[in-house]
Amino acid sequence: TLLDVGSGPATISLALAQKLKNVYALDYSTEMLNYANENAKANGIENARFICGDASDAAFQLEKEGLKPDCVILDPPRKGCGEELVKTISRMSPSRVVYVSCDPATLARDLKFFTENGYTPKEITPCDMFSGTSHVESVALIERN
């Protein structure tokens, strides 16, 4: 089971859906999740659930429902995840978290929150997606201790 937080049109999670039991995609944009739903239907993907709303609130609700994902993908806006979302995800106990960040400062802050909640960053890969600018994307692999 995969939880995709900040999924946008769920490109990553839908690409993996056929190899997974269930996919939960969270995003604040109804428009993006409509695209995700259309994409799932067009590709015959029936094991995906799309949830619109604030990431922290939606993740907390899924935790209350008993969701225990094997892996979480995080792709937050520039402000990062924040402590409450990290705590909620940590309580769900995924073995791995893949964090896609567009801000090294908020990534560093959120990695600190993960380490305080039983996780260890294993690998961080910077990606120059916007050549010639100061912007850098980073992908961090975080594992439960």
Please state what every model-predicted region is.
Residues 1-145:
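Rossmann-like S-adenosyl-L-methionine
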